[in-house]
Amino acid sequence: MSEAKPLHLVLGDEELLVERAVADVLRSARQRAGTADVPVSRMRAGDVGAYELAELLSPSLFAEERIVVLGAAAEAGKDAAAVIESAAADLPAGTVLVVVHSGGGRAKSLANQLRSMGAQVHPCARITKVSERADFIRSEFASLRVKVDDETVTALLDAVGSDVRELASACSQLVADTGGAVDAAAVRRYHSGKAEVRGFDIADKAVAGDVAGAAEALRWAMMRGEPLVVLADALAEAVHTIGRVGPQSGDPYRLAAQLGMPPWRVQKAQKQARRWSRDTVATAMRLVAELNANVKGAVADADYALESAVRQVAELVADRGR
């Protein structure tokens, strides 16, 4: 255990990544100790005092090695932060201290202090961008020894949404269910009940000018009771993406970096935008803005409002590019 890094800073507030980082530190420390029976103490960082922390970090008669995990360190008060800094500067041999810190909060400087002390940093920043979620999906599949293409990543994002924990679970389940043969068709097959799949399918048909196809897909989704707000949001996202990408030209990878989108999203929008003009995009944006209010209660018949908006958006480009 003496070779293990004694001080660890789990930095960020993406819960799944934080849990994994702490678990990795514990697993590594136990492996180095050669036993799973290493005492682990957990405590909120803001609740520690000098005496309590010294006691937690001190080897006992029964075990020379021990691990202390201090959570929510960003919210620790000034006194608690000082106690943690002091303890981290002089850890007893055989002790591992793990400090979980969001990176902000009133004890923001504590993270910088621990970093300057040589703490091993485990980045766990919240995953907020679509491109970051796409990278997370690829990483999850790679850890399961499965390689997926962009279409598969897109399908999974559309099917599962933005929750990182659900995305991780979906990746694991897909690999188990398909024996590793994961593609876009498999994603749609296993997640066919998700509203987002139908929402984006309807939106894609609408912005492609497929009036009949969009209307039919919408009726089917509504018959199954899909939330109107989700379907409306998918249409709005498709229109706004075309509005952002349409005026741009050039390499989709360069544009992706500029616009904060994944390259596959830019490439898809570039193809869709060929049907659209500045005026039709402006009209579509007005339609989806009105729809957003309508499906949230601005009109009595939200079903009709959604059907009308989908049809009107599709009709804007129904005769272009054919």
Swiss-Prot record:
Enzyme Commission (EC) number: 2.7.7.7
Q: What class of enzyme is it?
A: transferase
Keywords per UniProt: DNA replication, DNA-directed DNA polymerase, Nucleotidyltransferase, Transferase
Instruction: Point out the signal peptide segment.
Output: none
Q: Does the keyword Transferase apply?
A: yes
> Might you name a Gene Ontology BP term for this protein?
DNA-templated DNA replication
Its catalytic activity?
Answer: DNA(n) + a 2'-deoxyribonucleoside 5'-triphosphate = DNA(n+1) + diphosphate
Which terms in the Gene Ontology molecular function aspect does this entry carry?
DNA binding; DNA-directed DNA polymerase activity
Its Gene Ontology cellular component terms are:
DNA polymerase III complex
Give TM segment ranges. Answer: none
Q: Which InterPro entries match?
A: DNA_pol3_clamp-load_cplx_C, DNA_pol3_delta-like_C, DNA_polIII_delta, P-loop_NTPase
Q: Which function does this protein serve?
A: DNA polymerase III is a complex, multichain enzyme responsible for most of the replicative synthesis in bacteria. Pol III also exhibits 3'-5' exonuclease activity. The delta subunit interacts with the gamma/tau subunit to load the beta sliding clamp (dnaN) onto the DNA.
Similarity remark: Belongs to the DNA polymerase HolA subunit family.
- Which PANTHER family does this UniProt record tie to the protein? DNA POLYMERASE III SUBUNIT DELTA
Give the record's subunit note: Pol III contains a core (composed of alpha, epsilon and theta chains) that associates with a tau subunit. This core dimerizes and associates with the clamp-loading complex (or gamma) complex (composed of gamma/tau, delta, delta', psi and chi subunits) which binds Pol III cores each with a beta sliding clamp dimer. Interacts with beta sliding clamp (dnaN).
Q: What is this protein called?
A: Probable DNA polymerase III subunit delta
Q: Which gene encodes it?
A: holA
